[in-house]
Amino acid sequence: MCAWDHWWSGEVKMEMDVIKEYIDFAEEQGWPYMLIDWQWYGPYNKAHADITKPAPQLNMPEILEYARSKNVRCWLWLYCTDVNKNDSYKEAFALYEKWGIAGIKIDFMDRDDQEMVNWYHRIIKEVAKHKLMVNFHGAYKPDGIGRTYPNLLTREGVMGGEYSKFSKRVTPEHNVTLAFTRMLAGPMDYTPGGFLNVSMEGFKPKNPTTVP
């Protein structure tokens, strides 16, 4: 289980206090991990995006020390194009190992052609060298590579809980069916829910989500 700061409400931003609150939440729930999600290194998929440099408002050593004091380890989100830029992932993964990062979540691949499949394998192998776990978001369905590289913890490849922010397509019937379809292929990152208890008639997708 992992706390995930992407399910933001209202005007919550990528800030030190917010990250620490999610670390506290992970500790309270007995979860071992907290994911520092998109924009931790500033705007992503931009020419100047650098996956080795935290955004100016974030003090990464302080965050990681705080997490260690709570017996929580951190994951980092990455945009796939930023990972590929000049093979920057090789330097970045070595840096994350020094920081004590538990794993990385790479997002928005959205393809399953041969070139992309080969890329997945290169990334998994490089991550393994640095004792990091990996979660592929925006990913195709599992293909068995996790049997060779168990540091591939999970992947999305599913219409999961985050869709409830902007869609009514995630129904009880859909969720029950997943156990007999998608989950047969391998580990699944369903993504978080909003922890709101309403009937189907009373549910309204809203992004950003709000808590009454």
Where are these predicted regions, by residue range?
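An acidic-aromatic substrate-binding cleft motif
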Residues: 1-29, 33
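Short, conserved micro-motifs enriched in small and acidic residues
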Residues: 16, 210-212
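Aromatic- and carboxylate-enriched substrate-binding clefts and catalytic-loop regions
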Residues: 37-210
